[in-house]
Amino acid sequence: MNNKIKPSILPGFMELLPKEQLVFNDIVSKITGVYEQNGFLPMDTPIIEKEEVLLAKSAGETEKQVYRIDNEDRKQVLRFDLTVPFSRFAAQYMSDLTFPFKRYQLGKVYRGERNQKGRYREFYQCDVDVVGNGNLSIKNDAFIINMASKALRKIGLDSYKFQISNRKILTGVLEGLNITNMQEVMILIDKYDKITEEQFLSELNKLIGEEKAKVISKVIKISGSSDEVVENLKKVEIKNEMLEKGIEEVEEVIKYLKLFGVEDSEYAINLKIIRGLDYYTGTVFETLLTGNESYGSICSGGRYDNLAQNYTENVLPGVGMSIGITRLFFVLREIGFIENYNSSLNEKYLIVPIGDTFEYCTKILNKLLVNGKSAEIYFEEGKLKKKLTYANKLDIKYVILIGEDEVTNKELVIKDMITGEQKKLNIEEI
């Protein structure tokens, strides 16, 4: 009887083999490098938070997806994003921070997502946020989208589009139509791309009636260039302060994006973008890969002016965005991007001793390491073919062969595993 347990992991969790993990780490390093270059400071928060802290502003779908820890003494939950813990952090350490406070954070988050392809229950997010004390310029909204642009370009992506909106626009329209069940309507609009047009209109008619549904449907379908969308929004017959403020803010964000150098082809105004999380108050955006829109957003964010009010009397408005690194990696792997990922990950050296040359090999190793190269010695015995196969399987580009002649002449033989080219070098030439 075989009583061995089959090694496996739970659905909704990602594990990578070392070759892919190296690429994953390289992507993270490039993204966080962009953040640091632009003045964002690193920080971290606990994976486990008090339930009353984490769920102070959450309801609906968000609360249903939270993982709770079974503990009789206190209610604890796993964080479902990095933004809410950041708001708690900003309120808790307010006297120690310099505002506007710009931070980035990489960490795992947990959501009880329905098990499906590309959706994970544990996943890495890589966030940037700016929080102000009392007020925060709208320029930051555009700057955050600019950070997303720089990060995606840094890892080699150039075919994507930021879908930008402002929650005040739809809130203003709904208020102008005297709609009371606003939250239900917002949730339905957020699902627009996941259901058919007929289903959407049918559900909307049930919620607010046919006449009002026609108005909402017409507004969210306004499209074209950013200038055209703004002009058409200004022609909407509903007039109120909330709607006008939303139009003004989205117009400003577009203006500053242009000044930051974000290309027109990188963004569009999409009034169907709501963002499911309950804390957004103004600018919201999602990011779709051009030609691969079915995979959903790879980078999302927005403005949250009231999130910290659950923890402090002080006004700490914020804006931020999150790149779902785990989801992004899955999508890039699916579309073949990872296969051809451009990095220096294979610029490695494997030193192979032939005969009694180990001492000399360690000198070569130390010289390479001092010069910032990635290198290792093959310690095990065996045929040369086996050692070269080892290098090939690990995508090691260069193999250095050290025999007794090389030790005598203070030389080495270096073999390029891609081209097959082999040449002798003096030790000083390394």
Curated annotation (Swiss-Prot):
Compartment list: Cytoplasm
GO cellular component, one term: cytoplasm
Lineage, broadest ranks: Bacteria, Bacillati, Bacillota, Clostridia, Eubacteriales
InterPro entries: aa-tRNA-synth_II, aa-tRNA-synth_II/BPL/LPL, Anticodon-bd, Anticodon-bd_dom_sf, His-tRNA-ligase, HisRS-like_core, HisRS/HisZ
Gene Ontology annotations of biological process type: histidyl-tRNA aminoacylation
Family stated for the protein in its record: Belongs to the class-II aminoacyl-tRNA synthetase family.
Gene that specifies this protein: hisS
Keywords: Aminoacyl-tRNA synthetase, ATP-binding, Cytoplasm, Ligase, Nucleotide-binding, Protein biosynthesis
Catalytic activity field: tRNA(His) + L-histidine + ATP = L-histidyl-tRNA(His) + AMP + diphosphate + H(+)
Keyword Aminoacyl-tRNA synthetase: yes
Protein name: Histidine--tRNA ligase
GO molecular function annotations of the record: ATP binding; catalytic activity, acting on a protein; histidine-tRNA ligase activity; transferase activity
E.C. number: 6.1.1.21
Major site of localization recorded for this protein: cytoplasm
Self-association and partners: Homodimer.
Domain of life: Bacteria
